[in-house]
């Protein structure tokens, strides 16, 4: 489990990205880069890092499922992920 402060910071960054998304889009399209620079740094989606939604773990993130490989494995073995089954060939 990630530190609570890191998870809280990530949630705050996500909220800022959503809040400024439309404004950023219009400023970029109009080429008003001076105003774009004045926006908060964390409002840029480039600064976001994918984190597991269940544990907050930043490494081993699986985009398709939105969770870390460790949590994915646990849930898959328990049969809690629909459509996922153990491979055998």
From Swiss-Prot:
One of its GO terms (cellular component) is small ribosomal subunit. GO terms for biological process: translation. Keywords: Ribonucleoprotein, Ribosomal protein, RNA-binding, rRNA-binding. Coiled coil: none annotated. InterPro entries: Ribosomal_uS14, Ribosomal_uS14_bac/plastid, Ribosomal_uS14_CS, Ribosomal_uS14_sf. GO terms for molecular function: rRNA binding; structural constituent of ribosome. SUPFAM superfamilies: Glucocorticoid receptor-like (DNA-binding domain). It holds the Pfam family Ribosomal_S14. PROSITE patterns: RIBOSOMAL_S14. HAMAP family: Ribosomal_uS14_1 (MF_00537). NCBIfam families: PRK08881.1. Belongs to the universal ribosomal protein uS14 family. Binds 16S rRNA, required for the assembly of 30S particles and may also be responsible for determining the conformation of the 16S rRNA at the A site. Part of the 30S ribosomal subunit. Contacts proteins S3 and S10. This is Small ribosomal subunit protein uS14A. It comes from Listeria innocua serovar 6a (strain ATCC BAA-680 / CLIP 11262).
């Amino acid at each position: 489990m990630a530190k609570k402060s890191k998870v809280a910071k990530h949630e705050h960054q996500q909220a800022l990205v959503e809040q400024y998304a439309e404004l950023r889009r219009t400023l970029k399209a109009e080429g008003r880069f001076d105003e774009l620079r004045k926006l908060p740094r964390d409002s840029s989606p480039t600064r976001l890092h994918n984190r597991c939604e269940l544990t907050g773990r930043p490494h081993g993130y699986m985009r398709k499922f939105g969770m870390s490989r460790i949590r994915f494995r646990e849930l898959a073995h328990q049969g809690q992920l629909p459509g996922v089954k153990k491979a055998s060939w």
